[in-house]
């Protein structure tokens, strides 16, 4: 998967209008820290669903150019490529992302599929209502961002309707401070059950290749 990290900088070089470029390598084994809802299967760190996630923030025109370049440069051999256009909804950002190095800690990403019998407006309302609980319970996370999927760009890509990212500044924070306590964990499991049908869980290392200049 390292070839993704070495190849991705060409995106920013070819498309200077890209505001932010991040590569998340799915290379973290959560071990006993992994959490699942009752009845869910655990992830398989040795054979994850994806090897990497590439995040691009840019104008609509530059996003289209980036998608075309990713399709051309990264979809080789047996590689499976799934691209989505999302609308980010930051809830907590307590640390600035700095370009040029691996970010500390672990970035946990969930590709969300919501209950099929729920109208989109109801899902959005329930997910937005969940934010205050998540901020109170996930005390170890210094970044919490939700993404609403507005368009699937890859024909035949698996259905993904939302993306959640929680970033823990250290592995220990993920292990011991994911939830404020057992009751908080129970509340999270109960609340997401109202709108989340299933999710693909990815434990990643974040590499920021380009970031907006600090204010």
Where do the language-model regions lie?
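Macromolecular interaction modules
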Residues: 1-215
């Amino acid at each position: 998967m390292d070839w993704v990290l070495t190849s991705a900088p060409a995106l920013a070089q070819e498309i200077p209008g890209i505001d932010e470029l991040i590569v998340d390598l799915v290379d973290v084994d959560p071990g006993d820290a992994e959490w699942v809802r009752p009845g869910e299967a655990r992830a398989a760190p040795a054979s994850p669903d994806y090897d990497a996630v590439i995040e691009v923030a840019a104008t609509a025109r530059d996003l289209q150019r980036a998608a075309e370049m990713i399709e051309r440069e990264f979809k080789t051999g047996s590689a499976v490529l799934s691209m989505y256009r999302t609308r980010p909804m930051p809830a907590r950002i307590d640390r600035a992302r700095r370009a040029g190095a691996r970010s500390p800690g672990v970035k946990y990403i969930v590709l969300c599929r919501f209950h099929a019998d729920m109208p989109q407006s109801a899902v959005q309302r329930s997910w937005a209502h969940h934010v205050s609980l998540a901020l109170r319970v996930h005390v170890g996370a210094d970044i919490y961002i939700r993404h609403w999927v507005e368009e699937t760009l890859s024909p035949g890509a698996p259905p993904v309707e939302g993306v959640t990212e929680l970033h823990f500044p250290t592995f220990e924070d993920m292990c011991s401070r994911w939830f404020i306590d057992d009751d908080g964990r129970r509340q999270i499991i109960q609340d997401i059950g109202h709108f989340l049908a299933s999710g693909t869980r990815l434990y990643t290392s974040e590499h920021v290749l380009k970031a907006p200049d600090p204010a």
